[in-house]
Design a protein with these regions (language model features):
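Active-site microenvironment of metallo-dependent hydrolases
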Residues: 1-22, 26-32, 37, 42-43, ...
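Divalent metal-coordination and catalytic microenvironments
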Residues: 7, 24, 29, 54, ...
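Alpha-helical scaffold segments that flank or form the walls of functional sites
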Residues: 57, 76-128, 133-151, 173-185, ...
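Active-site gating loops and adjacent loop-to-helix segments of metal-dependent hydrolytic enzymes
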Residues: 72-106, 162-164, 228-255, 275-278, ...
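Metal-coordinating catalytic core of metallo-dependent amide/deamination hydrolases
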Residues: 129-262
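Glycine-enriched alpha-helix->loop->beta-strand junction motifs that scaffold or abut catalytic
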Residues: 150, 214-219, 251-254, 271-280, ...
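His/Asp/Glu-enriched, well-ordered alpha-helical/loop segment
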Residues: 248-251, 255, 297-380, 394-398
Length: 443
């Protein structure tokens, strides 16, 4: 038994959203009680007690779109790389990195990403992986890191024809085999999806193969209209817009997650809504790649299940929230834009996305939900109550303020110390791997 208490508790449970002095009791991987600290301690007097000391207690974060393979690109300088557009960024940086990754480097990239996620209070990660130099076994390598560190993750490999049809088919089989493996795993900590890069790198032949081989019970995770070229190519080669093409290939549906969706129109948004397909917004990436601003506020208004991701730019979901907030205010010239929509995406949207792949309820502190809890070092200087929670979180909190992270009832980090690995040793291994990757890329 574990109790975390003596903190300002944000539950994300509409029936009991805020407790001035709250506590959460966990038995194994399940929350068994949420209430006033004194009452919870009285109910479970023998439980291990973590004193939040007035700090904020809340559900752990969920990242709905991550790229583990990008971990070692931080600070990477590639000879001759001078991108003039998004396609140059893809080919000159990201596809170059993924073609050179070894299985060991992929695994260490996963350790680096998951450790940083833990330190930012993220315990559930939807990753979209690519390592076309070493495809087979790459998802299992990532899974090993996730299980070792105790985080929950949903994995896929981005299917693409960009490196030829042999590797394309291998990437299809990597997804198929991992999905079957994940479906047989009863831990509720691992899930799989059919990953796809984007419409413009996937032929009809490969679409048909995916349709034929995809196991039942899962959907797709694909970048959609991230850059304008994706749309132009689809119109030219297929005579239709991207979402229409995906719909025609039975890609859309409640288990499918579409990344970005920058260049989609009203008709496409209606298709996404009508098929109950999920969308994930990645604001920093869209801005950093100069791709544009998606009509995310319109999607939320239409009732499309929309979540928030980082696309590998950061592992701090609070940072992604802050950027999304100012991006849409700026883009729409509306000071009210994104105020309610973005926290809805981060908390309600990401939780619903995760709950389509994991059995236990995530993203909320309530009886029966998953024991995924964080403590944040935030002692507000202004009044805090259920009516102004989001204002405090957005303007007062960042990921580095997370002190304690619990996932599935296991304490992964306490008082900023990662407990589930020798962080210094892992980071030393990662630094060496990053150097070897950079040397290999630059010849």
């Amino acid at each position: 038994m574990l109790v975390i208490g003596n903190g300002r508790m944000i539950t994300q449970d509409a029936s009991n959203p805020f407790l001035e002095n709250g506590a959460v009791a966990m038995d194994g991987n399940t929350i068994v009680m949420v209430g006033v600290t004194e009452e919870v301690k009285k109910a479970y007097p023998d439980a291990e007690f973590i004193d939040a000391k007035g700090e904020v207690i809340m559900p752990a974060f969920i990242n709905a779109h991550e790229h583990i393979y990008s971990s070692f690109a931080r600070g990477l300088s590639i000879n001759g790389y001078n991108p003039q557009g998004f396609l140059d960024i893809l080919d000159g940086l990201w596809w170059t990195v993924d073609r050179h990754l070894t299985l060991e480097q992929t695994k260490l990239s996963a350790y680096a990403t998951y450790i940083d996620s833990i330190k930012n209070g993220v315990t559930t990660v939807f990753d979209h992986h690519a390592s076309f130099g070493h495809i087979t076994g790459s998802l299992n390598a990532i899974e090993e890191a996730a299980k070792d560190l105790g985080v929950r993750t949903c994995l896929c490999f981005e299917i693409s024809d960009r490196d030829g049809m042999e590797k394309s088919r291998e990437s299809v089989m990597e997804n198929v085999n991992f999905i079957k493996h994940a479906l047989a795993d009863d831990s509720d900590m691992i899930a799989g999806m059919m990953g796809m890069h984007a419409s413009f790198t996937i032929s009809d032949e490969t679409m048909a193969l995916c349709n034929e081989l995809k196991p039942e019970g899962v959907g797709y995770h694909i970048h959609v209209a991230e850059g304008i070229y994706d749309l132009h190519q689809c119109l030219k080669e297929h005579g239709k817009r991207i979402v229409d093409r995906l719909h025609d290939w039975n890609i859309l549906g409640p288990k499918t997650l579409l990344g970005h969706c920058i260049y989609v129109n009203e008709h496409e948004m209606d298709l996404i809504k009508d098929t109950d397909t999920m969308v994930v917004h990645n604001p920093e990436s869209n801005m950093g790649n100069a791709c544009g601003c998606p009509p995310t506020m319109r999607m939320v208004q239409k009732g499309i299940l929309t979540g928030l991701g980082t696309d590998g730019y950061t592992h701090d979901m609070m940072e992604s929230w802050k950027v999304a907030n100012v991006l849409h205010k700026h883009s729409l010239c509306d000071p009210n834009a994104a105020w309610g929509e973005v926290p809805q995406m981060l908390f309600e949207g990401n939780a619903e996305i995760a709950n389509r792949y994991f059995k236990k309820q995530l993203g909320v502190l309530k009886e029966g939900a998953a024991a995924d809890v964080i403590v944040i070092d935030y002692d507000p200087l202004t009044p805090m109550n259920e009516s102004n929670i989001n204002g405090h979180l957005m303007f007062g909190v960042n990921g580095s303020m997370v002190q304690t992270t619990v996932c599935n009832g296991k304490v992964l980090m306490k008082d900023r110390e990662v407990l589930v690995c020798d962080e210094a040793k892992v980071m030393a291994d990662c630094r060496q791997a990053a150097k070897e990757l950079a040397d290999d890329i630059n010849g």
